[in-house]
């Protein structure tokens, strides 16, 4: 006759005895904290205590645990699990519980902690993505809300507003370093005018009919200034999706204004123009040479016409700027190659080590553009595609958008890093950062060569505790791994696995071992399919 509740009743009695201090024959010290417990329970739930009490049982009344790896709250939680069979993290960090469970070789708890950390990382990534999508959409809606909130089309408001402003703009010189950028729209513009064709329009080209983008840009740029101050992220303005550089319907006509290379329709006016100031570094020669106003469409960046007959001088300045930028790209490419050659490997993985991959990716994109930029220097009328953030030029709008995406990935990487006031475990030798002190301590042994775990029987030292546990079985001659078919026992789990493949492979069609079964010191369950389960009947 079996009593199903007997095991539960036994655990309850042992837990009550531990709280009362009755028959507790062991004291565990974690820093200044003391924990009274029963040796039998500790040795049954932890391989660390099993090996500890196996050697000189009568002299092992007090156990000292490394407080740098095992914290008192984490051990209290694991001790409660040993006596009650329940694991409640409460407000305790999962990383601390994982470090303590790994130190004590409680592999079931290690598996649960790793799964919980994986779920937490996935949930944080999903929430971050949703927040970015929501903020991007809200900023775009806010930039267009004033034009459509009055119940009439945005074009009607733009037609009335800025005829007078455009007259003042045409008479006064524009600010150097400004750039026109079109917000994402459902239509694809068609680049039909070139700098040479823009010159043929002459001084009258500055006059544009009412309702053109040039007459509406001043009002909309002022309206969008407030939303740009609130949203400091540039990815709310730029369209990073790779679109075809050719497009436009048959009903579109070429605009007479040389500043804009696409026609004006009510639909296209909804993708309004926003003026973005390109911040220039005063100490950069490239930024001083490549000055002026540029208009960025989906097709690229074009140079505005010159009403003073100085177009040839601007072309010469542009060529000089391209040459200077080409030399800078070559130096950056050479430096990145030297860094990759000198970079050494390390087995430990840096938790926050994603930035180096992004920098190498950006350097690879720029170095691959060297032949294209060289060919652009030889063509006097070649269109240039300039980045509004760093003033770098590219041979096509597609590569420009890929380059822009690297800027935003760098911004996201900075946001992902912890704040400066957070004390992050950092290696003092190589500067790597880690999630908890346990992983930092393990990493520091790779630099110092320290082997703190010593076998009491033969004196051999090991870098990690699990290697000592595996070695200790050799001296005890214990064989914890048993075959369920022939009852032969083995010291190491690998020997058992090879034995099953050699002698029992014909009897068992397929065999799947539970995860971590090969790492545990006790006999684990084997999951068999229907054909193999017949052996038990």
UniProtKB/Swiss-Prot annotation:
Coiled coil regions in record: none
Ranges for region Disordered: 122-232, 335-355
Cellular localisation: Nucleus
Residue spans of biased composition, Basic and acidic residues class: 122-143
Keywords in alphabetical order: DNA-binding, Metal-binding, Nucleus, Repeat, Repressor, Transcription, Transcription regulation, Zinc, Zinc-finger
Residues of the signal peptide: none
Record-linked InterPro entries: BTB/POZ_dom, SKP1/BTB/POZ_sf, Znf_C2H2_sf, Znf_C2H2_type
Molecular functions (GO terms): DNA binding; DNA-binding transcription factor activity, RNA polymerase II-specific; zinc ion binding
Cellular-component GO terms for this entry: nucleus
Main localization, broad class: nucleus
Gene Ontology biological-process entries: regulation of transcription by RNA polymerase II
Domain of life: Eukaryota
Composition bias type Low complexity, residue spans: 182-195, 208-229
Domain BTB residues, every copy: 24-91
ZnF (C2H2-type) residues: 385-407, 425-447, 453-475, 481-504
Function: Transcriptional repressor that plays a role in various developmental processes. Specifically binds the consensus DNA sequence 5'-[AC]ACATCTG[GT][AC]-3' which contains the E box core, and acts by recruiting chromatin remodeling multiprotein complexes.
Family to which the UniProt record says this protein belongs: Belongs to the krueppel C2H2-type zinc-finger protein family. ZBTB18 subfamily.
The protein's name in its UniProt record: Zinc finger and BTB domain-containing protein 18
Natural source organism: Danio rerio
